[in-house]
From Swiss-Prot:
This protein is located at the 30S-50S ribosomal subunit interface and may play a role in the structure and function of the aminoacyl-tRNA binding site. This is Large ribosomal subunit protein bL19. It comes from the Bacteria. PROSITE patterns: RIBOSOMAL_L19 (PS01015). The keyword Chaperone does not apply. HAMAP family: Ribosomal_bL19. One of its GO terms (molecular function) is structural constituent of ribosome. SUPFAM superfamilies: Translation proteins SH3-like domain.
Amino acid sequence: MTNKIIQQLEAEQMSKEIPTFAPGDTIVVQVKVKEGERSRLQAFEGVVIAKRNRGLNSAFTVRKISSGVGVERTFQTYSPQIDSLAVKRRGDVRKAKLYYLRDLSGKAARIKEKLS
């Protein structure tokens, strides 16, 4: 049982509007990147391979192929570093964790699109 004050603080920090997405979906994450004095937005587009729902400690992992090399990045869902999330495509998968995609490449790593 968590303290009421802690619950209230977590609820305030979780007030950000996040679209619903699931493993297999292709999403675009706009990340705030600070370079010296200036700040800019960097888009990271890829397939969600894992999602961890733990309230304020929720996180998700996105995988993309960049210059022929697989790149994975784990984001905290309610992080202030995330500016926005957009779902580009819904994937039709049967597993919650898509770690098997790490071993696949090319056409074998494609995910069917959910129809509906």
